[in-house]
A protein has these predicted regions:
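Active-site and ligand/interface coordination hotspots across diverse enzymes
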Residues: 1-41, 53, 207
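Residues at the starts of beta-strands that form the adenosine-phosphate
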Residues: 24, 57-58, 102, 134
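Feature marks short, surface-exposed loop/turn motifs that line or immediately flank catalytic pockets
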Residues: 34, 68, 111
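Short catalytic helix/loop segments, enriched in acidic residues and glycine
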Residues: 44-52
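Short connector loops at secondary-structure junctions
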Residues: 57-75
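Glycine/proline-rich loop-helix segments at beta-alpha junctions forming the active-site rim
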Residues: 75-189, 203-206
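Short polybasic linear motifs
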Residues: 187, 196-199
Length: 207
């Protein structure tokens, strides 16, 4: 069903899920639920339909946290740093694998519920902000100014550009402790992407 599928820890983590295509849409949510390579869930079904309706013949669902959980409040308050880093690098890898990256930001209000959501967002953005990336949101923003989660959408809506830099600086109140160190931000995105892609295409991965 889905030829893009990366999971870990006996499927307790899902890094990426999607379908290959000539025109790819990357989606960044909060955390994965029950969808697998052989079975979609409600979120994946909506995401795939929105992608097709808007001219994308492929998509990949990524998340700020890779831990599977059906309710966000059941996620741990803290997460292993290496799990976070591996997930962040995979997000970067998939985004940069597209010649003209388009990224649908789709986390909703829940991004404020765990610090590691914000840490992951900052890491990914700061690492690749010099790249030409089309950051998008679908439909109206939430009352608090967050890009809306796919569980609450109208297929008649459309994509609009999203100023992710301003969002991080002002919409999200970001304590200093959440910001990556200067050493972390020195990661070369092309190098990270090459290392992760070595020997295989990012959009043709089933494990």
């Amino acid at each position: 069903m889905f030829d893009i599928y990366i999971n870990k820890q006996a499927n307790k983590q899902r890094i990426a899920l999607g379908k290959s295509g000539e025109k790819m849409l990357s989606i960044i949510g909060l955390n994965p639920s029950i969808a697998t390579a052989d079975r979609a869930d409600a979120t994946i079904t909506r995401v795939e339909k929105v992608a097709k309706n808007n001219g994308y013949d492929g998509f990949v669902m990524l998340n700020l946290c890779p831990l599977r959980c059906t309710h966000i409040n059941l996620l741990p308050l803290n997460i292993n740093a290496q799990i976070c880093l591996n997930n962040q690098l995979q997000i970067i890898n998939f985004i940069l694998a597209s010649p003209e990256p388009a990224v649908w930001l789709a986390w909703g209000e829940g991004i404020t519920l765990r610090e590691y959501f914000l840490k992951s967002l900052v890491y990914v953005f700061e690492t690749i902000k010099s790249e030409k990336i089309n950051w998008l949101h679908f439909g109206p923003l939430t009352k608090a100014g967050h890009p809306r989660h796919p569980s609450r959408l109208n297929y008649q809506w459309g994509f609009d550009s999203f100023d992710l830099n301003s969002y991080i600086l002002s919409r999200v109140s970001m304590p200093n402790k959440l910001r990556p160190s200067s050493k972390t931000l020195a990661v070369n995105p092309q190098s990270a992407s090459r290392e992760l892609r070595a020997g295989s295409s990012a959009f043709n991965t089933v494990t």
